[in-house]
Design a protein with these regions (language model features):
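Membrane-interfacial loop-to-helix junctions in multi-pass transporters
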Residues: 2, 80-86, 121
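Alpha-helical transmembrane segments in multi-pass membrane proteins
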Residues: 4, 8, 12, 17, ...
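C-terminal ends of transmembrane helices
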Residues: 21-24, 94-104, 133
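Transmembrane helix interruption/hinge and helix-loop junction motifs
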Residues: 78-80, 118-127
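Membrane-interface alpha-helices at helix entry/exit sites of multi-pass transporters
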Residues: 42-45, 49-59, 85, 120-124
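Short helix-capping/hinge motifs at transmembrane helix termini and TM-loop junctions
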Residues: 15, 29, 73, 77-78, ...
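Cytosolic, membrane-interface loops and tails of multi-pass inner-membrane proteins
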Residues: 23-53, 105
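Conserved small/polar residues in nucleotide/adenosyl-binding loops
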Residues: 125-132, 136
Length: 136
């Protein structure tokens, strides 16, 4: 068995298990974000419960978490994109199903965006630009 797949999967999952929404809720308002609003441990619920500023902070941290999992895998296994994909997908799964929160996490959208940005940021930049132009 090639242990590189396992290493990528475990590191990606552990990156994903870091729940920024939970820690921001505890540190800033001393609340468990899963007990307020939509009861979802994600950036959208933080925005509803704690305000736009903290929602943006959580979203950025979740995006960075998805990107960091991919970047670490690309650093450990240069030129082997399959390990980066595995790390990114497992980071999303870790965000949705974190083991230390009884497998109740967020929806994984910001982590998915972070994974896409790390894998091919030029393509994502163009997509976001087109989306912004079509809205205004």
């Amino acid at each position: 068995m090639d242990y590189n797949y396992l290493i990528s999967a475990i590191t990606g999952y552990l990156f994903g298990c870091f729940q920024a929404s939970y820690f921001v809720g505890i540190l800033v308002n001393k609340i468990d974000i899963r007990e307020h609003g939509s009861t979802n441990a994600g950036a959208s619920n933080v925005t509803m419960v704690m305000g736009f500023k903290w929602g943006v902070v959580v979203a950025v941290l979740d995006i960075l978490k998805g990107s960091a999992a991919v970047w670490l895998s690309q650093f450990l296994f240069p030129g082997q994109i399959e390990f980066a994909f595995i790390a990114g997908i497992c980071a999303i799964l870790g965000h949705i199903y974190p083991f230390f929160m009884k497998f109740q996490g967020g929806k994984g959208i910001a982590t998915l965006i972070g994974m896409f940005l790390a894998l091919n940021w030029r393509s994502e930049e163009r997509r976001v630009g087109k989306e912004c132009r079509s809205r205004w």
